[in-house]
C-alpha cells in the first residue's frame, strides 16, 4: 500500500471542506493495482496529475461517491482503469452518483459497479 495523497501533513491546517484532507492510496498485489480515492475531488486530482504521480490502476474506487466534483476526464485519462467501483448508499439524499460521472465512465468505456444497485462488491486478484 502506498499513500499518494496528501503530500504534506494536514495537522494544524484549516481546510475549506473535509474532502481536502482526504487520503488516497494505491493497493498493489502482484500486477493488480487498485486506486482508493476516498472523497477526493477535482482540485486534488489535478494536483496529483500536475506532480506526475503514477495513477495507473486496474480498479478505480470512484471519488466522493460519484459526485460531480470528482472523477474528471483528465483524471480518468491518467488512471485508465479497467473497471470502476462506486460506493454509494441507496436512495441517498445527494442523489449520487451523478449522471455526469456515469456519462464520463461510459465515454471512456469503463464498466462500473455500484454498491446501491449491485450490493457488496468483492475485488479478487491473483
Locations of the language-model features?
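Non-globular, low-confidence helical/coil segments that flank catalytic cores
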Residues: 1-126
